Amino acid sequence: VGLMDAQGRQIVQSSRSEPSFIGTMPRTLRSMFQRFPRGSWRPGDVVISNDGYLGTGHLNDVTMVTPVFRGEKLIAFIGSIFHTVDIGGAPSVEARDSYEEGLTIPICKIVREGVENEDVIAFLTDNLRAPDDTLGDIRAQFAAYRQAEHRLLKILEEEGIDDLDGLAGELLERSDASMRQAIRVLPDGLYRDEIKLDGFDAPLTIKCGIKIEGDRIEIDYAGTLSLIHI
């Protein structure tokens, strides 16, 4: 579970979260903003997607996000990513593209203003081998959002804070400064390495280049295959 400010910048995440999930959630939320601009979100909405090309991961990693309002003002977003036991598709290691791997859920509102979208629910469950298990996972996220929203609003009330704008800015500035300080300790230069894997059809090579310059670091994987069969 992660907490983003009203701009979609992640400021809090569970210490037990997968690093890959922590990193992809803000990117997925930015994609959601293209489909649903921030002004179109309403209290009780939940937006869902598992489209890996938008940042979620592979198809079994489902991202959902809900807005948090204080009065009429949008103050935050709460999101989570969960790995569903089944997402449809052919149970075969011979899958060559995402269409064979399972169902891609486009960005859509699975809950509108607190009411489950029965059409989206039916579309999902009718394409799954374990619909009850997956639907249980989805509704567990709904419950987590309600609890997180309740606790967030309670903290704001207790501390006399209207929104997260100032707090989010301070947290992000401190995080940025801390990371830049850690980078400055490293010698400037360009560092390259590669690892070789057995692969599935043929051996694979993953290449990585790291450029350090002052308080900046750039990482690229030039020379690594973009799409592979695993």
Describe these PLM feature segments:
Residues 1-5:
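Short hydrophobic alpha-helical segments used for membrane anchoring or interfacial signaling
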